[in-house]
Amino acid sequence: MTKAIYIVFLSIAIFCMTTLAHGSKNYPDSLTQEFYDIGPSVQNAIKTANAAKLAQYFNSSVNLQVPGKSGSFGKTQAEFIIKDFFSNFPPSSFSINNQGKSSATTTYYIGTYKSGSKTFRCYYTIIVFDNKERINVLKFE
C-alpha cells in the first residue's frame, strides 16, 4: 500500500514540476488580472481621441496606418501620428463590429470610426508579450 501512495505522490510531483517548467511568460496566469482587460481602455481612448492614453498600450514598435502615413513606428512617434490623426479627424463615434483571437497571444478588433461625414474602418491587434498586452497594429482606413 505504501508503494502505491508513493507512486501517486511521485506522479503528482512530476506533473506539477512539468507544468511549471513548461509555463510561458507570454501567457496570462490566474494571479495577473491585467490580461485581456485593455480592450475597453483602448476603445475608450479611441472614442475620446486620447492619444496619450492609447500610446500607453503601444508595443515598442507599432505598425500604423492613417491617411497620409503608413509604416512601422516607434511608440513615441506613433503617439504623435495618432494625435495628429485625432486632431484632423475628431471622433463623432466609434464602435467595435467584430473581435476575436487569431492566435493564443493575439486578439484582433475591427470597428467603425466616424469623424463628421468621414467613416474609417479601424483595425487593431493586441498581443501578449512579456506578461503585458500591447497594441502592435493600428489602422484607420
Which role fits each region the language model picked out?
Residues 11-19:
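Hydrophobic h-region of N-terminal signal peptides that target proteins for export
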Residues 64-71:
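A short gly/proline-enriched turn/hairpin at secondary-structure junctions
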